[in-house]
């Protein structure tokens, strides 16, 4: 089963700034605004059977569909690992879940808000800002595989369980940090 892990970074207006994909068989690839290409993105996913995200059904994939014109959920099986986490009583954003499971991160302290700040720092020409943003996104996509392995869902396809945490309705903000 060939799988890919997808994560995006955005600015405060939810415009894509970085799109990252990790394929265990090919490594990571990232696209930075304005150099997005629907063709390149889908070409990199060619041969993939399953795409995994964290909160991707509500955040990443709708933005990719709207802004890149790539409907990932109609082209590939999608598994949102956030739902698997909920089924295992692991709640919170990706970084919080990683910490609970002992998944290491070199970009400790960088979160979604900091990613927005890094994007603006890059746009102002600050040295190193884009590099740190790309390392952060790369860790996101690579750590999704570590998360899937810890959850034991790597060989599974199709949607994750749809169990919502007790007392939580729809989350309208991004549950990633």
State the predicted function of each range:
Residues 102-167:
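Acidic, Mg2+-coordinating catalytic module of metal-dependent nucleases/exonucleases
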Residues 17, 64-66, 149:
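Short amphipathic alpha-helical segments
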């Amino acid at each position: 089963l060939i799988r890919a892990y997808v994560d995006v970074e955005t600015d405060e207006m939810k415009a894509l700034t970085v799109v990252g994909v990790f394929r265990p068989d090919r490594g990571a690839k990232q696209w930075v605004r304005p150099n997005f290409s629907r063709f390149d993105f889908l070409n990199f996913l060619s041969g993939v059977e399953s795409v995994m995200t964290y909160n991707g059904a509500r955040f990443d994939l709708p933005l990719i569909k709207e802004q890149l014109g790539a409907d990932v959920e109609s082209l590939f099986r999608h598994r949102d690992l956030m739902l698997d986490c909920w089924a295992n009583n692991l709640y919170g954003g990706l970084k919080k879940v990683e910490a609970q499971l002992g998944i290491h991160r070199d970009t400790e302290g960088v979160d979604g808000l900091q990613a927005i700040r890094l994007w603006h720092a890059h746009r102002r020409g600050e040295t190193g800002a884009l590099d740190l943003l790309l390392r952060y996104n790369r860790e996101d996509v690579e750590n999704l595989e570590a998360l899937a392995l810890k959850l034991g869902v790597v060989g599974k396809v199709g949607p994750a369980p749809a169990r919502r945490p007790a007392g939580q309705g729809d989350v309208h903000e991004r549950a990633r940090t």
